[in-house]
Design a protein with these regions (language model features):
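Basic, short loop/linker segments at the boundary and entry of helix-turn-helix/winged-helix-like folds
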Residues: 22-64, 69
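Hydrophobic alpha-helical membrane-insertion signals
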Residues: 1-30
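Intrinsic disorder/low-complexity signature
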Residues: 1-4, 35-37, 256
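Anion-binding and metal-coordination hotspots
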Residues: 5-6, 70-82, 93-530
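Short arginine-rich
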Residues: 88-92
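An anion-engaging/catalytic patch
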Residues: 85
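Short, solvent-exposed coil/turn linker segments
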Residues: 18-22, 35-36, 40, 153, ...
Length: 530
């Protein structure tokens, strides 16, 4: 806000607008108070053990109401308290909140904010707004606050570290020749320790001359050059090892936000598949309300189902049906659902292409061959047996895939060109398959093919994808304004609570509170007459 009295001797007048009149609450404010007024805020504490000046309930109202109005930064929230009538009524006229107070509240109460989110979901259930039968999951990638070109790649760091160790070994040999270090062959496996000792010996003996002239026409002494290069290489090695320790199973990170991972985004401003530092956000939705959320560094969605299901386990009720798109079609997702006795309505990866005639008539696919469970082999169209030959591991699946091969009869087969795609280079038919995964895929395909399965698929697109669209378009949340996974997740949970509040406000205006949302597909006239 501009300061209009900065260069003026006559100061601007201040008027007190807190007159004696009442303002009717909007539906958003009614929904906000309904959801968060009687929750348990005892988990919020202070570092010094004394009661804070501002109640956590009021601070949560500020965060959520600010997010509903597109204000997420601490300075914007500070101005929001001063300018908004509802916030004036919540905090009073004599309370001033500094932006640092808001920032500290978010940083120190990350677990408590997640607990308030869980309590608000239970409050929605008590209002009759949740169906408690079907849960939908989907994910998105949201860009981090980190710079786009602050990448650190794991493979490049490992190569540079090997080169750095080689240079350190060379410097260590120079130190040994100058009688500054005494080493054996075993010391060259970890050369940084004896080289650091050599640098300390140079400093202790006073051999380093920091006032030595530099520039054109001046040559550094051997000791000065050795020490400067050693300090430089040791600092590089320390930084490279620090980066590798922070990878934690990832292949990249950002220097300015080490929790962010570089991913390929749909919002590509250069239209060339550029990688950006981002977080993988997952939402679980029931009746158009976000009931659980998680954050991870996974670049794909197939390993994130377990995180959401663990969050759903904390709710006092259990879901019987789980629905997700083909990005979650993996054996781990099915196994996690079977542990919890949840029916899996996961769209198979070949759902769309399986409807085509060419896919169903492809004789080279394992699904179109006959499997003999007794002999553990497949029978192709020519009647030849493809027997088990071994296992093959992959990054995507925790369990290895089974490899089947046909060792005779493929060269002279009349169907060779249709069965083997690369028939000019490959002599025999060979494919990989996960029988357990394939069996679960068939069950999910049958469930989704029913009339109820069609409704579940339609509701998945409407509900969970609609919530992401609302958060990105209505709230403008396309890039986080905080650093670190914990702080970013707190910011996201506040946005989720604001989304649920806006949805409840719309339901209050429509007079539909107590009837969970479910889109039903209208029957065709032929089905109605039948």
């Amino acid at each position: 806000m501009s300061n209009n009295t900065l260069n003026s001797l006559r100061k601007q007048l201040t008027f007190d607008f807190m007159l004696d009149f009442t303002v009717e609450l909007t539906s958003e404010e009614v929904a906000l108070l309904t959801l968060f007024e009687n929750l348990d805020y005892s988990g919020f504490g202070t570092r010094l053990g004394r009661k804070g000046k501002i109640e956590p309930f009021r601070m949560m109202l500020l965060l959520i109401h600010g997010a509903m109005n597109g204000r997420t930064s601490s300075r914007e929230l500070e101005r929001h308290v001063e300018r908004d009538l509802f916030m004036k009524a919540v905090f009073g006229t004599d309370v001033h909140i500094d932006h640092s107070t808001i920032s500290r509240f978010i940083s120190r109460n990350q677990e408590q904010i997640e607990d308030i989110f869980r309590q608000s979901v239970e409050k929605l259930a008590s209002l009759g707004e949740l169906g408690k039968k079907v849960v939908f999951q989907d994910g998105t990638k949201i860009e981090s606050r980190a710079g786009r070109y602050t990448f650190v790649w794991k493979s490049a760091t490992e190569k540079n570290m090997e080169k750095c160790l080689s240079r350190i070994r060379s410097l260590l040999r120079e130190a040994v020749d100058a009688d500054l270090a005494q080493t054996d062959e075993a010391s060259f496996k970890e050369p940084e320790k004896p080289l650091a000792s050599a640098v300390s010996a140079i400093d202790e003996k006073g051999l380093f001359n920091p006032s030595e002239k530099k520039g054109r026409g001046h040559h550094k002494s051997r000791i000065n050059r050795l020490r400067e290069k050693a300090v430089e290489e040791l600092s590089k090695l320390e930084m490279q090892r620090k980066h590798l320790s922070m990878m934690d199973g990832r292949n990249s990170l950002s220097r300015t936000d080490t929790d962010a991972t570089f991913m390929r985004m749909k919002e590509d401003h250069m239209h060339n598949g550029q990688l950006k530092p981002a977080y993988n956000i997952q939402n679980a939705v029931d009746s158009n309300y976000i009931i659980a959320s998680s954050i991870s560094s996974d670049r794909a969605d197939y390993r994130t189902a377990g995180h959401i299901l663990a969050k759903l386990d904390k709710l006092p009720w259990k879901y019987g049906i789980y629905c997700a798109d083909s990005g979650y079609d993996c054996l781990e997702s099915f196994q996690e659902l079977e542990k919890r006795e949840i029916e899996a309505y996961i769209k198979p990866q070949d759902w769309e292409i399986s409807k085509t005639r060419s896919y169903r008539s492809d004789i080279g696919r394992s699904a179109n061959m006959t499997y003999v469970e007794k002999d553990d082999c497949f029978i192709c169209k020519n009647g030849k047996r493809l027997t088990f030959s071994g296992l093959r591991t992959s990054r995507r699946n925790s369990r290895p895939a089974r490899v089947y091969e046909c060792h005779r009869g493929c060269i002279s087969c009349q169907h060779r060109q249709q069965c083997i795609k690369n028939h000019r280079k490959v002599r025999y038919k060979r494919f990989e398959v996960q029988l357990e995964h394939q069996k679960r895929q068939r069950i999910a395909h049958e469930l989704l093919s029913t009339s109820f399965g069609a409704e579940v698929r339609a509701n998945r697109s409407i509900q969970v994808e609609g919530r992401f669209a609302f958060q990105k378009q209505q709230f403008g949340l396309r890039r986080f304004s905080s650093f670190g996974k914990a702080r970013v997740f707190s910011e996201w949970l506040v946005c989720c609570m604001a989304t649920n509040t806006a949805q409840l406000a719309a339901r209050i205006e429509q007079g539909k509170v107590g009837t969970p949302f479910w889109y039903r597909i209208k029957a065709s006239p032929a089905e109605e007459t039948a």
